């Protein structure tokens, strides 16, 4: 059995070389501002602050400040101990035993193993309806699939409290990326005493307590959330930012204006402003590689995209370099759903995408003709996306390209984030904008979204061959075999076109140069405010 804890030797085994696992690391000689307030744009109101209900990254950013799981990911994406101060792993890699710190909720109640068990059980409880119900199946938690489907009771899930301070997790197979998965809110604890008192309303502004570095101070709907340091956080003494504000500014242009007016310290960048920033304030621009794919998914349960030939025609005629490199900029054209940089992935050669666009257009027109579409009966459909300047540019480019190349009649429909999510999740669309920000660094973080049983499979493409490929990939212990299977999965996506990969997107933002400690090498886009500080 292997034991992991916070020590120099074991930290080196984990790829962590700092003896201080938790603190805002301030270089010697740095003068700190008297006002340690960090203000970031998180786009829109979170759907919920309940860890098991989080489904958008902007909400997750707030939740990872308010709450803390068993581990966290440092600036290099490496696993660090969090609520668990150490853990052991069985020799077969299937059983993890976590020893918890003497930690407290913000109301003084102790954080117990029961809190983690309840959190994980809620995630797969079919009566609760978590949008990430399949998350624990990705980690191969024992009986997660069966519990999620209502075939087994909650207490059969592979997590149990050995005592108040020990959590035992059982997997169905050794999973190299298991610990990485524990950084996402779905695996965070919930306060069992608050759950007993308020039920699922425990996470409202009036009732919420948290176990992270920050606690909720105020939630002004459609404006901002303000959080302040949690004095009961186990490592509060090493936290420097006193107040963290999350502003809801959907307009990139307006957010950038607020940044220029020094009302924001961190926000996304309007595409048209990037050249100006690169020329005049390059130190303010941050471009961090991350594991993110922007794509459009077809609803294969509705015409016209229940026809594979129609889907394939659009897939072939998209000018990815034009959109990624010129219309949007600083993005990489995507040929596969999984980015090439993902660990354990060797991107297949999608030969047809290497053909000249003119040849692909000819092939696409032939497919449309076979499907019954021509100049007299043009293809008609609707593009659906959430309101956001970049998404608007992409949608307009798609409509323009398909009109130009195929004579398609394309309409646009856009909605605010929450409404868009609701419509998308119930399948009220024909072709919808989507993106995946990997929760862990492995191809299944992307490909699992297309499993027939996945709640993320809103396009309803169901393919038994794909499901079997993914099952085989997850069960093999041979890295080469697994990589080959992932290639096969991507080839099948290219053949049947349930979606159209468009580009891989880095994190592109402007930051107040006075902010220190920002993670520049975490490809999973985790930014913990407790690691930041403000210089004078």
List PLM regions with ranges.
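Alpha-helical secondary-structure segments
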Residues: 113-119, 164-170, 212-213, 240-243, ...
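Structural transition elements
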Residues: 332-370, 388-393
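Ligand/substrate-recognition segments at binding pockets and active sites
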Residues: 221, 361, 365-438, 479, ...
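Long beta-strand-rich cores associated with HINT superfamily self-processing modules
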Residues: 509-536
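N-terminal lobe/hinge region of extracytoplasmic solute-binding protein
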Residues: 41-91, 209-210
């Amino acid at each position: 059995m292997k034991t992991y804890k916070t020590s120099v030797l074991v930290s080196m085994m984990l790829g962590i070389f700092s003896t201080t696992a938790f603190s805002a690391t301030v270089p010697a000689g740095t003068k700190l501002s008297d006002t340690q307030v960090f203000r970031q744009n998180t786009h829109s109101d979170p759907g919920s602050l309940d860890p098991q209900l989080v489904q958008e990254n902007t909400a997750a950013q707030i939740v990872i400040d308010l709450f803390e799981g068993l581990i966290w990911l440092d600036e290099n994406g490496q696993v660090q101990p969090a609520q668990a101060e150490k853990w052991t792993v069985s020799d077969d890699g299937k059983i993890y035993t976590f020893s918890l710190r003497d930690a407290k909720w913000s109301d003084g109640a102790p954080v117990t193993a029961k809190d983690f068990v309840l959190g994980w059980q809620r995630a797969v409880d079919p009566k609760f309806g978590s949008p990430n119900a399949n998350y624990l199946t990705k980690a191969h938690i024992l009986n997660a699939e069966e519990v999620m489907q209502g075939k087994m009771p909650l207490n059969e899930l592979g997590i149990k409290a050995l005592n108040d301070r020990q959590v035992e997790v059982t997997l169905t197979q050794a999973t190299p990326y298991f610990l990485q998965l524990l950084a996402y809110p779905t695996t965070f604890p919930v306060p069992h005493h608050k759950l007993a008192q308020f039920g699922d309303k425990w996470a409202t502004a009036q009732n919420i307590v948290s176990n992270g570095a920050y606690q909720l101070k105020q939630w002004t709907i459609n404006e901002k959330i303000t959080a302040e340091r949690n004095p009961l956080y186990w490592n509060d003494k090493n936290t420097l930012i006193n107040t963290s504000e999350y502003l809801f500014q959907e307009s990139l242009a307006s957010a950038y204006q607020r940044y220029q007016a020094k009302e924001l310290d961190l926000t996304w960048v309007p595409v048209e402003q990037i050249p100006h920033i690169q020329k005049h304030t390059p130190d303010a621009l941050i471009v961090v590689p991350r594991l993110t794919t922007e794509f459009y998914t077809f609803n294969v349960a509705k015409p016209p995209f229940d026809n594979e030939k129609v889907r394939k025609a659009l897939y072939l005629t998209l000018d990815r370099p034009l959109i990624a490199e010129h219309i949007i900029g600083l993005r990489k054209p995507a040929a596969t759903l999984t980015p090439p940089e993902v660990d354990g992935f060797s991107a297949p050669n999608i030969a047809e995408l290497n053909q000249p666009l003119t040849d692909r257009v000819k092939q696409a027109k032939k497919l449309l003709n076979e499907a019954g579409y021509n100049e007299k009966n043009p293809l008609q459909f609707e593009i659906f996306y959430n309101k956001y300047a970049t998404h608007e540019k992409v949608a307009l480019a798609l409509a323009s390209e398909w009109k130009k190349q195929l004579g398609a009649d394309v309409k646009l429909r856009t909605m605010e984030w929450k409404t868009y999510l609701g419509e998308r999740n119930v399948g009220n669309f024909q072709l919808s904008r989507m993106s995946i920000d990997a929760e862990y660094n492995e191809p299944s973080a992307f490909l699992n979204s297309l499993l027939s049983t996945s709640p993320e499979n809103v396009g309803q493409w169901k393919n038994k061959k794909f499901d079997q490929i993914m099952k085989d990939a997850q069960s093999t212990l041979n890295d080469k075999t697994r990589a080959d299977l992932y290639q096969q999965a991507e080839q099948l996506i290219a053949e049947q076109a349930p979606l159209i990969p468009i580009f891989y997107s880095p994190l592109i933002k402007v930051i107040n140069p006075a902010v220190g400690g920002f993670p520049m090498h975490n490809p999973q886009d985790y930014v913990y405010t407790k690691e930041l500080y403000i210089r004078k």
